[in-house]
Amino acid sequence: MAFTLRVYGLLVHEGCVLVSDELIKGQRITKFPGGGLEYGEGLKECLVREIREEIGVEALEVEHFYTTDFFQQSAFHSTPMQVVSVYYTFRVADPMAIPVVQVPFTGITGPGDQEVFRWLRLAGGREEALSLPIDRVVWGMLRGA
């Protein structure tokens, strides 16, 4: 059995949630910020590291929100790989200090992996705005919360 463990952060501010528009292996992906657990790391440590690396801010008041409770095949592995994703809510000292774009994928060019961030309105937003199946489940939970 092969698994990949992913940890994602949910930053909600003024009715919006922060999402990441990323170019990953040539594919345009919109997802919640976060990434893979590294060996020797705890789940919260992973989230704090990922947020620091990706966004350049400290994740504060990290609280568990959801852990995948269904099977999901990884779309990014050539061999069978089950994805287990853990989602945490968090806050930052100044959400408005995070550099964001208004239009998805603005400024992403070239072949290498890249990312930009933007605020996605919860009210009136659609789950289809997110690329990953587990993120779409979490989107529905956020909207209902």
Which ranges hold each PLM region?
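N-terminal strand-loop-strand
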Residues: M1-F32, V92
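Short, catalytically relevant binding-site loops at active-site mouths
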Residues: K25-G26, L37-E38, D69-F71
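A generic structural micro-feature
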Residues: M1-F3, I29, S78-V84, P111-Q114
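The catalytic Nudix box helix
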Residues: F32-Y66
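NUDIX/MutT-family hydrolases
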Residues: T89, V100-G140
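Active-site-adjacent beta-strand/loop module that shapes the phosphate/pyrophosphate-binding cleft
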Residues: F70-Q102, V137
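A structural signal for short, well-ordered beta-strand segments
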Residues: G9, H64, V86-F90
